[in-house]
Amino acid sequence: MGAPSSLLFSTAHWRTVPFLLAFWVLLSTGTAEDPTMTPEFLRHISEKIPEEYQNPHCFTRDLNDFICFWEGERRKNASFSYSEDDQIKWCQLRTEVASNNTWWYICEFPVTDVVLFAGITISAYPCHKCQTAREIYINELVLLNPPLNVTVKEKQDPRGLLISWKPPHFQKNHDINNEIKYQVNYSTPGADMQTVEVEAGNTEIFLTDIVPAAYTVTVRCKADGVSYNGYWSDWTAPITIATIIDLRLLLLLSIAIFVALIAGVGVYIFMRHGMYLKHKVWPQVPTPENNFQGLFTTHKGNFKLWLGQADAYLLWISRHVFQEDPSSTLEVLSELPPAALPQSFNPNPLKDSYVVLDENRMPCSLEWLEAQRHKTVIVGAESMDSRLQTVNKDVVLEDTSKGQIAVKANNRVHSLEGDGSQGEAFREDEYVEAPRMEHERHRVSRENSVSSDGKQSIPSSFEYTELQTCEGLLSPKPRPVPPRMPLKYAYLDMSSSGEHSPPPSPNFYQNSPITNFLAPIYSQS
């Protein structure tokens, strides 16, 4: 029983030896065949690698593997060798059909021979475009996988697209994330592709200046730093996002449309019911303009002028009185000759007769004087003659005949002819003054005084007139029209010595409708 059992044990032991040898060969020569190393994948990698990188092409995807390949003629004696620290090693090649006459020769380095930051010398045969031997560094031939978890979000404040991703995964814990840079492609339908490069270490980008459209975004990466370098990876799967219109712009547009609509409705309502709304919102304030026509336009608010009770003569507009100044009263003083007459010698009243002594000195308002004379011919003459009789008893005027006036003074009779060339004969110390009404103006009289040469000066008086202003208008204070003055006194031109004194200056502020009347001429010794 013992012999057969030992025989079976020895037979089973020898059957497991080939499997152990195969496993040892795999560990010593390399890893198992990579199923991704298809002819299509190798063609894609060869097209991706730039031309400056010569054959054979080598790369590492996760810093844990290293693969070299090239395209050459079909040979059974093809070989690939690499050396590190002057120790040459031969790689077991794997072939894939490239075309009708060429094969892909593939060498996969064992994991134990993948050494970073150390130079490796490689040589391949047959390879017409390959150097006999060249030195490479695995950490400079990195071919990364595309970035992971690419996301695109639309932001409104500020408006734009936020694109983010994660770096590719590595089997070994290598600090390479800070040495990977990225490229982002984005485009809209009908527009050219735009590429933005992101600096190493950043894993997001914010795109501004976007428009409402559908955006397609892709991302790729590349090792580009001090320690690692390599090739651009494949682009990620495209991500499409449709952006909407800017909410702020939409809000502003909505507000503008709403305001325009409200304005249109308001204009329509105002055009249709404007007067009604005006009376409702702003009631009409009562104004006297409707009841006082012309008071505030023609008469400038002067109520007296509007009633017709003010003077209709010259109105003086002061340039120095403003509308905001309060109303004031102005008094004007003027010096006038006295109204006293010498005593009359004739107790009898004078008759109302006159003669024109000088035809060249006619009254300015003869028609008005004639009309007034007919109205008050009796009353005026009697009152004036009676005053002359009571005031002066030394001078008497008598009518001698038609066209003549006799003046009797100091028992001497002087005849005034109708011819103006003969003149009048009076004594130098005698004079006749046309009487003036006492109530015509206010007077401030003064007594007779003696002049510097010893002669007695003529008594004089001061007249003042009150003037009132109303909105810049200055006019004399209104007075009633004085009674008629006998016309004959306006023509008395008497002189005994031939010397005539100049007439007094005209008073422009005298409220009299006969301001153009010739003032009496006085004769004094």
UniProtKB/Swiss-Prot annotation:
Glycans are attached at residues 77, 100, 149, 185. A motif (Box 1 motif) lies at residues 281-289. A motif (ITIM motif) lies at residues 487-492. Residues 33-249 are extracellular. Keywords: Cell membrane, Disulfide bond, Glycoprotein, Membrane, Receptor, Signal, Transmembrane, Transmembrane helix. The record marks 117 as: Required for ligand binding. It holds the Pfam family EpoR_lig-bind. Residues 447-459 have a biased composition (Polar residues). It comes from the Eukaryota. Residues 271-525 are cytoplasmic. Disulfide bonds join 58-68, 91-107. SMART domains: FN3. The chain crosses the membrane at residues 250-270. This is Erythropoietin receptor. It comes from Xenopus laevis (African clawed frog).
